[in-house]
Structure formats: structure tokens, C-alpha cells
Amino acid sequence: MKIRASVRKICEKCRLIRRRGRIIVICPNPRHKQRQG
């Protein structure tokens, strides 16, 4: 899980989701997991 100021999709399978007011990227590739800090 990377915590970044700006999250974006890395591949076409990444999905942007809002959880508890935070933007999260979930993807089958675990290296692409991100969260907005």
C-alpha cells in the first residue's frame, strides 16, 4: 500500500474507490494498491 498525495490508475485493471472519505486504488496487482494521504 503506497500512500500518496495524488493517486491514479497505473494499469487498466486498477479501480478507484472512495472509502471513509479517502480515495483508494484496488487492483489484482498488489503493487498498485494506493491510498490518498
Curated annotation (Swiss-Prot):
GO BP terms: translation
A Pfam match: Ribosomal_L36
InterPro entries: Ribosomal_bL36, Ribosomal_bL36_sp
GO cellular component, one term: ribosome
Principal localisation: plastid
GO molecular function, one term: structural constituent of ribosome
Subcellular location(s) of the protein: Plastid, Chloroplast
Keywords: Chloroplast, Plastid, Ribonucleoprotein, Ribosomal protein
Source taxon at top rank: Eukaryota
Family of the protein in this entry: Belongs to the bacterial ribosomal protein bL36 family.
NCBIfam families the record matches: rpmJ_bact (TIGR01022)
Name of this protein: Large ribosomal subunit protein bL36c
Annotated organism of origin: Vitis vinifera (Grape)
Species classification: Eukaryota, Viridiplantae, Streptophyta, Embryophyta, Tracheophyta
